[in-house]
C-alpha cells in the first residue's frame, strides 16, 4: 500500500516519462527568496507575500545623470539639484519641469527653502552657497572657501546652517556677505558634515564623516553627541513627528567619497534532489540587527530622551536616503538595490514598498499625502501615494536545475486574481534564446508546466487586482541523470588496513521514520576510515561524486598487469574504501578498477556508471633469501 501511495504522489508531480535522477521541488515562500526576484509594480511584505504596490508615476526627467539634492516650497514646487553640470530644475504640482538655475560648479549637493520662499543651493567642489530668487536669478550668499558644501538647513530664526568638508565645520549665516570667521558656528574634529536637520524645538542635528557621529546643538549652540556609530558616515538625518531622529549610517565601502560598487550577482537556486541523503548544512542563524560587524547600511532611531535603537541594517543593500513616516512609526529607505524603496517600522519590521528599476534612490521626501523619490544615474523624479497599480508583475529568480530538466507541475497559494506563467532556457540570464512565456495558469491547485526541457526555469506572477496576494509558489522538476565520477584512487602502503569508524548513534525512532536526521539537528559528516596495522594488507581508498546527489554503490576489481580481464573482488559497497589480504594474491604487478553506479537511486533504464583504474602496484609476499654468487676465495682467516 505504501508503494502505491508513493507512486501516486510521484505521478501527480511528474505526469511525464521518467528521464532523470531524483525528483526535486523548488519552493519560493520566504522573504529572502522572494526579494531575489524582480518586483515590477508589486510590494513584498515581511513574510515574503507579494501584493500590488503603490502606483509609481514618473513626473520629470532632468536629462542629467545625478540628482544630489531636493527641496519643496510652500506652494508644492519641487527643486532638484543635479550633477555634473550644476543645474537646478523646478517642477510644479502638475509635473511640469524646467531649468531654474545654472550654477558654475559641478554638483548641487544641497538645497533648502528659506522662510521667505527663496532657494539656497550649496555646490561642490570648491563650492559656494547661492541664494536664488523666484525668477531663478542666483547670487552668492556665502563663500566659506571650503572644498565641499554638503548640507543646508534653515533654523527657526531664519539663519542658514551650512555643513562643509574637508574640515568638518558648521557655519550659521544670517545675511549675505558674511565672512567665514564671523559665521563659524562650530568647528568639529570630523572631516565632513554630511547631513543637517532641525527639529520643531530649534535643535540642530549634524551627521558626520569619518567618525559616524550624530551631534545635537541646542538653540543656544551647546553641542552634545547623541550617537557614535561604528560605521563611517551619517549620510542622512530625518526628524520624525514625535521628535525622534532617524540617522542613516554608511560603512567605509559605500561612504560618500567612495564609488558605489556593483552588487554581486545573486546565486541561482540549485537543484535539491527529493530524497538524496547528502548532508544538509546547518541553517545560517539570523543575526541581531544590532550586530553591525558586516553592515553596509544602518538606520538608527534616536529617541527624544537620547536613547537609540537600530531599526534596520543590511550587509548587502546600500541605502542613500530617508523619509520619516508622518505616523511616527519608522521611515522609508531609498537604496541602490534596483532602486528599491523599503518601509521599516520602529520595531524593525521591513517591507519592500516598490522597485523603481533605477540605479539609486538618491533622495526621498513627502508633501501633503504623497511621497517623492529622485533617482540617479538617470536623474528622474517620481511620485507615489495611496493609489495602487491596476496590475503588478513579479518575476522570480532563475532556477538552475544543474542539468537539463523535465518540468513537472507548478502550484501556488494566492488570494484574489493571480496568474502564473513559466519560461525556460539554457543560458543563465534569460534572453531571446529562451522560450516565450507560457499561457497563463489561473488554478492555484496547479498544472503541468508546458515550458520545454532546459537547464534553467523562471516563473512570473501577474497580480490582476488590488485584492491579489501571492504567498508561495512550488515547482516540481526532474533533472537529467548525470553519470557519477571517480575522482581519485589511492593505494596505501603494505600492512595498513582500513576499518569503518563506529556509526553515529541515532534515535531508532528517527531511523524507522525515514526522516532525514538533519531535520532534528543531527549532522553526520562523512568520516574517514580508521587505519590499523594488518599484516600483508593492501588497502585502497577513493573519492567519488554525483552531481545529482544520488547515493552511490561501488565495486572493486583487480587483474595482473599483463592480463586483460578484471576479476571481481567485492560489489555493492557503500563505503569508499576496501582492504584485501595481500597474501591471497601471488607475487606480481596488479591494477585495481573501481566502478560506481547510481542504480540504487534511479530506475534501471536510467542508471549510470563510472569507472577508474589505479596505478599499477606490486605484491611481494616472498621472504628474502641469500644465494651464493661465484666461487669462495680463502685468504688466511678470511673468506669471500
Label every model-predicted segment.
Residues 59-63, 100-104, 141-145, 185-189, ...:
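Surface loop/turn motifs at the tips and blade-to-blade linkers of beta-strand repeat domains
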Residues 72-75, 113-116, 154-157, 198-201, ...:
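Residue-level detector of Asp-centered blade-edge/turn motifs that repeat once per structural unit
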Residues 23-55, 130, 171, 215, ...:
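Blade/loop signatures of beta-propeller domains
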Residues 24-34, 250-294, 604:
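Short, conserved, GDST-rich strand-edge loop motifs in beta-rich repeat architectures
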Residues 77-80, 118-121, 159-162, 203-206, ...:
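Conserved beta-propeller blade signature
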Residues 22-24, 29-33, 38-41, 337, ...:
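Beta-strand-rich ligand- or partner-binding modules
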Residues 87-90, 127-131, 169-171, 213-215, ...:
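A short loop-to-beta-strand structural motif that recurs across blades of beta-propeller domains
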Amino acid at each position: 500500500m505504501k508503494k502505491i501511495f508513493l507512486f501516486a504522489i510521484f505521478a501527480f508531480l511528474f505526469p511525464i516519462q521518467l528521464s532523470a535522477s531524483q525528483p526535486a521541488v523548488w519552493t519560493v515562500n520566504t522573504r529572502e527568496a522572494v526579494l531575489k526576484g524582480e518586483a515590477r509594480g508589486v510590494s513584498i511584505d515581511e513574510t515574503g507575500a507579494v501584493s500590488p504596490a503603490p502606483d509609481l508615476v514618473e513626473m520629470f526627467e532632468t536629462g542629467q545623470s545625478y540628482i544630489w539634492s531636493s527641496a519643496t516650497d510652500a506652494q508644492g514646487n519641487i527643486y532638484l539639484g543635479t550633477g555634473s553640470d550644476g543645474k537646478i530644475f523646478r517642477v510644479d504640482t502638475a509635473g511640469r519641469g524646467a531649468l531654474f538655475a545654472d550654477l558654475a560648479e559641478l554638483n548641487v549637493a544641497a538645497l533648502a527653502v528659506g522662510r521667505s520662499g527663496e532657494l539656497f543651493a550649496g555646490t561642490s567642489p570648491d563650492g559656494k552657497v547661492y541664494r536664488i530668487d523666484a525668477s531663478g536669478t542666483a547670487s552668492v550668499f556665502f563663500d566659506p572657501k571650503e572644498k565641499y558644501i554638503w548640507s543646508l538647513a534653515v533654523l527657526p530664526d531664519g539663519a542658514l546652517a551650512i555643513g562643509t568638508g574637508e574640515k568638518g565645520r558648521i557655519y550659521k549665516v544670517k545675511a549675505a556677505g558674511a565672512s567665514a570667521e564671523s559665521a563659524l558656528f562650530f568647528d568639529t574634529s570630523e572631516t565632513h558634515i554630511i547631513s543637517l536637520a532641525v527639529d520643531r524645538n530649534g535643535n540642530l542635528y549634524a551627521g558626520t564623516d569619518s567618525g559616524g557621529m550624530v551631534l545635537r546643538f541646542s538653540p543656544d549652540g551647546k553641542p552634545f553627541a547623541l550617537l557614535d556609530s561604528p560605521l563611517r558616515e551619517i549620510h542622512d538625518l530625518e526628524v520624525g513627528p514625535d521628535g525622534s531622529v532617524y540617522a542613516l549610517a554608511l560603512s567605509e565601502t559605500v561612504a560618500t567619497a567612495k564609488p558605489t560598487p556593483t552588487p554581486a550577482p545573486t546565486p541561482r537556486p540549485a537543484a535539491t534532489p527529493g530524497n538524496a541523503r547528502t548532508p544538509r548544512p546547518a541553517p545560517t542563524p539570523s543575526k541581531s540587527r544590532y550586530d553591525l560587524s558586516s553592515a553596509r547600511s544602518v538606520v538608527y532611531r534616536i529617541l527624544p530622551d537620547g536613547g537609540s535603537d537600530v531599526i534596520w541594517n543590511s550587509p548587502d543593500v546600500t541605502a542613500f536616503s530617508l523619509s520619516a513616516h508622518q505616523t511616527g512609526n519608522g521611515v522609508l529607505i531609498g537604496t541602490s538595490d534596483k532602486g528599491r524603496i523599503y518601509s521599516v517600522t520602529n520595531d524593525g519590521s521591513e517591507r519592500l514598498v516598490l522597485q523603481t528599476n533605477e540605479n539609486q534612490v538618491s533622495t526621498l521626501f513627502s508633501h501633503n499625502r504623497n511621497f517623492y523619490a529622485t533617482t540617479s544615474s538617470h536623474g528622474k523624479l517620481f511620485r507615489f501615494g495611496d493609489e495602487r497599480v491596476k496590475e503588478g508583475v513579479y518575476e522570480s529568480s532563475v532556477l538552475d536545475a544543474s542539468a537539463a530538466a523535465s518540468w513537472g507541475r507548478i502550484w501556488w497559494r494566492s488570494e484574489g486574481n493571480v496568474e502564473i506563467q513559466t519560461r525556460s532556457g539554457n543560458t543563465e540570464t534569460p534572453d531571446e534564446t529562451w522560450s516565450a512565456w507560457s499561457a497563463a495558469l489561473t488554478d492555484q491547485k496547479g498544472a503541468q508546466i508546458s515550458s520545454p526541457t532546459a537547464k534553467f526555469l523562471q516563473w512570473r506572477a501577474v497580480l490582476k487586482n488590488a485584492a491579489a496576494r501571492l504567498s508561495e509558489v512550488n515547482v516540481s522538476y526532474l533533472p537529467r541523470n548525470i553519470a557519477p565520477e571517480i575522482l581519485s584512487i589511492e593505494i596505501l602502503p603494505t600492512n595498513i588496513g582500513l576499518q569503518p569508524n563506529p556509526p553515529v548513534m541515532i534515535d531508532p525512532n528517527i531511523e524507522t521514520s525515514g526522516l532525514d536526521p538533519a531535520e532534528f539537528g543531527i549532522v553526520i559528516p562523512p568520516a574517514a576510515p580508521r587505519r590499523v596495522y594488518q599484516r600483508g594488507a593492501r588497502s585502497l581508498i577513493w573519492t567519488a561524486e554525483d552531481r545529482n546527489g544520488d547515493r552511490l554503490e561501488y565495486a572493486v576489481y583487480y587483474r595482473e598487469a599483463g592480463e586483460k580481464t578484471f576479476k571481481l573482488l567485492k560489489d555493492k559497497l557503500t563505503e569508499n574504501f576496501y582492504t584485501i589480504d595481500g597474501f591471497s594474491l601471488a607475487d606480481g604487478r596488479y591494477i585495481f578498477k573501481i566502478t560506481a553506479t547510481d542504480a540504487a537511486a534511479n530506475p534501471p533504464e536510467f542508471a549510470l556508471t563510472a569507472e577508474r583504474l589505479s596505478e599499477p602496484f606490486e605484491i611481494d609476499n616472498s621472504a628474502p633469501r641469500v644465494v651464493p654468487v661465484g666461487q669462495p676465495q680463502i685468504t688466511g682467516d678470511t673468506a669471500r
